[in-house]
Amino acid sequence: MINDLKKDSEQRMLKTLESLEQGFAKVRTGRAHPSILNGVMVPYYGSDVPLNQVANVGVEDSRTLIVQPFERTMVAAIDKAIRESDLGLNPITADSIRVPLPALTEETRRDMQKIARSEAENAKVAIRNIRRDVLGDIKALLKEKEISEDDERRAGDDIQKITDKYVAEVDKRLAAKEAELMKV
């Protein structure tokens, strides 16, 4: 029973780390990467769909993305969606769309660091919330006399160790992302 709770908490914390990586992927580092445009939604036959469902997104060079729509009629809509996204990008339109990434200034890098720190803090909060939920479940087992106080204390210590491990992993990934952001 306690082992199931531990496994469940670890799986949920692992999903939180995966979510953190997705959040970090949205933070621009100055190098072109197709995931930068993952959050862009394009109007397509009356509904908004992710850009990667209506176009191929690739890297032309280190500072330029190339977007090749599946349908030529989508070029204007994709161009508009990229311009209106909060990424601060200005695409160049022809048959395909070239998206040059402006060089990051020191100020922009600092802003990106703040965003990365915010993502990391959100991940830590999520991990701590998972810990709180699991500790609550363990206390409920103790109240129902399904486990002893010693088992409850031991399980609480184990959950804390798991939590510390994942919080340290978040810190490690944040440090790596910050180093990547500050690299010119």
Curated annotation (Swiss-Prot):
Gene Ontology annotations for the cellular component aspect, listed alphabetically: cytosol
Listed PANTHER family: MITOCHONDRIAL RIBOSOME RECYCLING FACTOR PSEUDO 1, RIBOSOME RECYCLING FACTOR
Tagged with keyword Signal: no
Biological role stated in the UniProt entry: Responsible for the release of ribosomes from messenger RNA at the termination of protein biosynthesis. May increase the efficiency of translation by recycling ribosomes from one round of translation to another.
Single GO MF annotation: ribosomal large subunit binding
Positions of transmembrane segments: none
InterPro entries (UniProt xref): Ribosome_recyc_fac, Ribosome_recyc_fac_dom, RRF_sf
SUPFAM superfamilies reported for this sequence: Ribosome recycling factor, RRF
Compartment list: Cytoplasm
Keyword RNA-binding listed: no
Similarity annotation: Belongs to the RRF family.
Assigned keywords, A-Z: Cytoplasm, Protein biosynthesis
Protein name: Ribosome-recycling factor
GO biological process terms held by the UniProt record: cytoplasmic translational termination
